[in-house]
From Swiss-Prot:
The modification N6-(pyridoxal phosphate)lysine is found at K235. Gene3D superfamilies: Aspartate Aminotransferase, domain 1, Type I PLP-dependent aspartate aminotransferase-like (Major domain). It comes from Methylobacterium nodulans (strain LMG 21967 / CNCM I-2342 / ORS 2060). It catalyses: 6-carboxyhexanoyl-[ACP] + L-alanine + H(+) = (8S)-8-amino-7-oxononanoate + holo-[ACP] + CO2. Pyridoxal 5'-phosphate binds at G114, Y115, S187, D212, D213, A214, H215, T232, L233, S234, K235. Homodimer. This is 8-amino-7-oxononanoate synthase. GO terms for molecular function: 8-amino-7-oxononanoate synthase activity; pyridoxal phosphate binding. Belongs to the class-II pyridoxal-phosphate-dependent aminotransferase family. BioF subfamily. Pathway: Cofactor biosynthesis; biotin biosynthesis.
Amino acid sequence: MPASLTPSLDAFAEAKLAGLNAAGLRRRLVPTARTGGARAERGGRPVVSFSCNDYLGLATHPAVVAAARAALERYGAGSGGSRLVTGDHPVFAELEAELARRKGHEAALVFGSGYLANLGITPALAGAGDLILIDELGHSCMWAGTRLSGARTLPFRHNDLKHLEALLARERGEARHALILTERVFSMDGDRAPVADILDLARSFDAWTLVDDAHGLGVVGPDATAPLEMGTLSKALGSYGGYLCASRAVIDLLTSRARSFVYTTGLPPASAAAALAALRLIEAEPERAARPLALARRFTARLGLPEAQSAVVPVLVGEAEAALALSRALEARGFLVVAIRPPTVPAGTARLRIAFSAAHAEAEVDALAQALSELGAAG
């Protein structure tokens, strides 16, 4: 190995890593190969995965794979540039039209990822002199977008309409514009936001609302439509990318002002084609979309947990090391359920985040519930 070029930098990194190790918070990459359905090979051994966000099992669906392959052969491996230069391949317009239609909006804009979408949307719409109110459990990328915006940002207690209303009543008058940020399905808790009620509040205070539907699209039924509906192509759609659905005027503005759209290479056309095929499958096969929630509710009923509201069910453990130990115990029994630790979740709330897929068999769900019961982790 060559000698370090920057000893002080390495010393800094090693000290930080030591602290992460001591707290049980160091992350490591573990090669994991999907082998079909909800099964995978991890560390050389087969497991049933309950940590994958491919909620509908479409990432390996023959029609989705075929659409990606056809686009790959026609357009090549990459888009070749920013979409505003040479990277706007025809499949993007098809995908955006389908997303907008499904969401009941005039237009849509596809980004490089859901994270990039939130990094671009909020700073393009809000800035100094504006007010942002965000659910305290909003995803990291929503918070990152607020910080980039420069707007005054205040969290409201999770799904607490009274607190949100009080903040609007107190703060809205001094702000030029107000933007409310929430998730339709919260990624770490699996519960749902009262979107219709939030929209009613927003209208009464002339505030705009952005709903992050990353974990809801294709899995939970439709509810009220927000003026700004964003999400990802990487979960139920089994592909990669992010999007915003909104009015034509807003989409045109974002096309010019969202820095994470303007200054980055467009998605590979194959990813867009795969997402488009997945959207069409969801519409053609509604029974597929109903399955993850049904399996999640089967699981919560077996363990006496609150009824699942989405395809995500948390099993709270508490401390990070305890969550890691439980995850290892499950993996020894053939189940991959990754421990979620701070800072992804608040300190003291480390958990197993269990994600259900249409690819799971009922017997696999029952076996996981039995394993958790035997380990004394739930119920």
